[in-house]
Amino acid sequence: MQKFLSLIIVILILYNIVKLKISPDNNNLTTVEQTASNNSSTDENQTSINNEPPISLNGNLFERTVSKIVINALKTEEGKAFFENILQPLNGPINPNDYTIEVRKDLVKTLFKINTLGSGNIGPASCGHVVTVFYQISDMNNTLISEDTKTFTLGSAPVMLGLDNVIIGMMVGEAREAIIPAKYAVNNSNNIIFDDAYNYKVNVILKSILPQNFVKSNEVKIYDDEIAYRVPLLCGEKVSFNAKITRLSNGKILYDSKAKGQQIDMKIGDITYPLIFSYALQGKVTIGTRSVIAKGKTFKTLGSNINKIISHESLPTNEYLLLELGDFKQN
């Protein structure tokens, strides 16, 4: 559907460009015919022609309407940004000359209808952090089902998988309300069982985060070479993928799973992998390549001396590195 929509809009824009090329000639022919048929109104016709917009739109009502929308939209910064996100390349691998799209929309917030209340200055929480939260879970009729203060690792899903993902991105002291779709009411605990045929309302307050190693969104740039409206990867889910780490200062490749011939099999939130891996995978749709620019310190593991990807000693912690993730297969 996404490719079809992109194709339709591309065709409309190309159609409009063609009309821009040929409309001056059509205007001249029309002017000559009008002048020959009625010489007495030459001055009036000329004045009318000079006052007309330079673009002449032909076709049926639908074509003219869509063309006007495209033209007017491209005159604004918002319109240009819209088409930048819609008219994306449909190729797979990235290289520096390819066109990529900066990721602006958090699909996870949309999926869970998350609303954030209050503010905090410690965080944000990432998949793999140990958090202490107070939560309330109700049915859609606001009947309270479960209420507790609990400490757990994000991604372990001791209550329900959806709750872990609602907490991602929170600051200590913030509160969130969300709706957990039935599919994400599953958990890894035998103590709390939710019926996965129903949606649930969740209210949660974040009380603490450990360890206090954070990925700040303003220090990281994330780009995708393809976008699609699909269910994204979530904290606690398993995925296979290829990863490549490049040092931006000299182009040296520090790690390349494809060159090794061995894909990475990872549960998002596994603290034996670099923190930036879980951060980048959270909310990713499993198509195309995701490119992440971040400092070397974010490639350290979260509270573990074991790093399955790259040794801490070889990491240039204060330099920016490029991480490329692709060839996704969700387990």
Swiss-Prot record:
Region of interest (Disordered), residue spans: 33-54
EC annotation from Swiss-Prot or TrEMBL? 5.2.1.8
Keyword Isomerase included in the entry's annotation: yes
Give GO MF terms, alphabetically: peptidyl-prolyl cis-trans isomerase activity
Question: Per the record's keyword annotation, is Isomerase included, yes or no?
Answer: yes
Its UniProt entry gives the catalysed reaction(s) as:
[protein]-peptidylproline (omega=180) = [protein]-peptidylproline (omega=0)
Domain PPIase FKBP-type, which positions? 128-226
Any GO BP: protein folding
Q: Which domain of life is it from?
A: Bacteria
Name the chain's protein: Putative peptidyl-prolyl cis-trans isomerase RC0542
Native source species: Rickettsia conorii (strain ATCC VR-613 / Malish 7)
